[in-house]
């Protein structure tokens, strides 16, 4: 089961206050429902691939309306051939859709009533229903952080975005295929949203994974930085050793001033050491990092003069 499925499973098991559960049902029907006309009557079908969500829609309809509904299971004939589930109402559709403020004079309303936004508990329930209907969230272990909710209508998408940003979630919106999405990219905000809609266990799991992942990334950055520094030291050390060997072959290390001799011998004997550590190995030391660097530069200059065939005044 995917992480998103785990989140939705937890949400379908959540007990919601009677006064707020209708807001969740409103979102589920508005975003997953479709209307057809049979015998001059509206028939409402709410479709989902998640059996737990289908059962929740069925229970909520039964909880609020004294109307018989049916739960239909069908099988896709393409691709994965998964089951999908339809909750269908053949009677009372008009009354239910009007009560849920989805239908007005036989027209589908694309937006949520403005007065609805004044009730914090209902907003949270509506967002929970919206996520159950068309939401998705990436697995925090394997993917980039991303949570989104899809809307068919732009006005409705704007409302979803506004609802989420009431809680400082920094939600953004964009057009996607034949509709629109509101999405979150920040790990902290995704965790806040999961908590907001009641997915507490999923939020805690998300946070645990995020902490481990961030720690792993931090360790990797440190290791990469240290590796880069070691590579830099190794490259510089190789160049210094090549130059010292050239000086020894053409002139002789023993012909160098004592300070340069000490550094040359120390570097040849300890090619892997940093400048700081090298300074502590000098017989007359310890020598500061800048002091060692200065002497090695002198040796490099001598080697370059030898390569250029110039006279070496420092000898």
UniProtKB/Swiss-Prot annotation:
Question: Would the keyword Lyase turn up in this protein's UniProt record?
Answer: no
Keyword terms = Cell cycle, Cell division, DNA-binding
Feature: DNA-binding region: 274-308
Q: Does the keyword Cell cycle apply?
A: yes
Q: Name one GO biological process term.
A: regulation of sporulation
Q: What does this chain do?
A: Involved in cell division and chromosome segregation.
GO molecular-function term, one example from the UniProt record: DNA binding
This protein is called what?
Answer: Probable cell division protein WhiA
């Amino acid at each position: 089961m995917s992480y998103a499925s785990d989140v939705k499973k937890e949400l379908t098991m959540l007990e919601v206050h009677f006064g707020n559960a209708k807001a969740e049902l409103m979102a589920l029907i508005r975003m997953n429902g479709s209307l057809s006309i049979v015998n001059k009557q509206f028939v409402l079908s709410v479709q989902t691939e998640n059996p737990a969500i289908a059962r929740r829609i069925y229970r909520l309809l039964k909880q609020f309306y004294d109307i018989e509904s049916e739960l239909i299971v069908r099988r896709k004939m393409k691709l994965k051939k998964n089951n999908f589930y339809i909750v269908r109402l053949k009677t009372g559709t008009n009354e239910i859709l009007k009560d849920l403020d989805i239908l007005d004079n036989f027209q589908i309303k694309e937006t949520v009533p403005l007065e609805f936004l004044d009730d914090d508990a209902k907003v949270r329930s509506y967002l929970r229903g919206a996520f159950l209907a068309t939401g998705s969230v990436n697995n925090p272990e394997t993917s980039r952080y991303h949570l989104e909710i899809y809307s068919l209508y732009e006005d409705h998408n704007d409302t979803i975005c506004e609802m989420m940003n009431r809680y400082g979630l920094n939600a953004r919106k964009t057009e996607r295929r034949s509709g629109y999405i509101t999405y979150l990219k920040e790990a902290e905000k995704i965790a806040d949203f999961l908590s907001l809609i009641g997915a507490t266990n999923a939020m805690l799991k998300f946070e645990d994974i995020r902490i481990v992942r961030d720690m792993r990334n931090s360790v990797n950055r440190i290791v990469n930085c240290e590796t880069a520094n070691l590579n830099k030291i190794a490259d510089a050390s190789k160049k210094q050793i090549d130059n010292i060997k050239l000086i020894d072959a053409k002139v002789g290390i023993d012909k160098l001033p004592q300070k340069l001799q000490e550094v040359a011998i120390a570097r040849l004997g300890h090619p892997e050491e940093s400048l700081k550590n090298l300074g502590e190995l000098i017989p007359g030391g310890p020598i500061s990092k800048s002091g060692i660097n200065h002497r090695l530069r002198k040796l490099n200059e001598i080697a370059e003069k030898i390569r250029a065939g110039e006279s070496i005044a420092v000898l």
